[in-house]
Amino acid sequence: MPSRRDIFWLAGTAGLAAINLGDAVAAVKNPVRVRTITAGVELSPALELERVEAALTFLTRAKQTLTAAGYEVQTVRVASNPVIASLAPAARSKALEQLRKIDQLIAAHGAVFSTGPIATEDRTDDSLIEWSQELVRATKSISISTVIASPERGVLPKVAALSAKIMVALAQTLPEGLANFRFAAAANIPAGTPFFPVAWHQGPDGFAIGVETPAVVERAFASLRPSDDPTEKLRGALNEVLLPIEKLATGIAQREGRQYVGIDTSPAPLKDRSIAAAIEALTHRPFGTGGTLEACSIITAALKSTAVKSCGYSGLMLPVLEDPLLAQRAGEHRYGIRDVLLYSSVCGTGLDVIPLPGDTSAESIEGLLRDVAALATRLRKPLSARLFLVPGKQAGELARFNDPYLTDSVVMKLD
């Protein structure tokens, strides 16, 4: 009987419309980018500007070190402890002015900032809905999140309901629903996660690194032979590119006196580096068809077993609006939202930048968020939901975005 590797090898390339794996792989000269260096800082309710500025100064030096070593560093970011969640509504409103100042400081350095979760206890606080809208109107570089599940308390249903209401409100706050790019509902997300909008900090000043490695994954699978174990092949390829980054990071930590939290090994895709293409390099079938779930599991097994110190999700990301091939396969109706949730059971980050109809109800979103929270709780893994309600669009219609980081996509059906 043929092995799993033989089946993948013999499957051929039928159905792989719109991509040429050989050309795509050859076109990528440097297979790894540093998506983010994220510095973590502990702030008091005063939201001290000098603490943020010190983190930005550190990030400038850290970026210079990585750039000098030949790495493209796409973003630098600062994440704080969940100080906003500790404030009463009146104090939270007063904090908006200081957050505006932080936003100006952050923007001047070409960085972005996360306040950490704004809701961490399972209670109803609808004042956070309007506050979230005011924040995204008043700032350009600040992200927020909520906690819909935690390892200690499990699912937080009241926060899930609140999060759904925030998503509906944010969809009407900025053009094209883009405010939801800066908000996510987080389940079991640990401190030190470098990726936004769920990043948050706890403890001594530290930093973490997020990487963009879909090209590494694709190269590893494109060169796979029948005798190769795909997990071992990918693990070796990842170690080859991640260990040099970790060596630089530990050196930075020693010089700067900051804790090195680790590398989030998640292969964050972008428009020109597709995780869907990497998966199809393994399955030789369009993403969403048979074999996709197993491929997700294989990739995740490699991501979870690298030789570097890992942090955050360290799992497979499937962001529909950031990966043109994922968006294309969704438009071909090869997978749906529930399929992505299924893939999350064996892979990574949950539901990320999923385009939904603009009139989706808060009740429908709440149900989906509770599903994400339940899955994260049952499997004891970090998941999140960043959902894009597209104003004026219905399921099946094409949504276009005037944003360099987002790709056009068919709006997906929720229920």
Name these PLM-found stretches.
Residues 1-14:
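N-terminal secretory signal peptides and thylakoid transit peptides that target proteins
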Residues 1-2, 19-30:
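C-terminal segment of N-terminal export signals and the immediately downstream linker at the start
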Residues 9-12, 19, 113, 355:
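Generic detector of intrinsically disordered, low-complexity, polar/charged segments
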Residues 25-415:
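Anaerobic metallocofactor- and corrinoid-dependent redox/one-carbon enzyme cores
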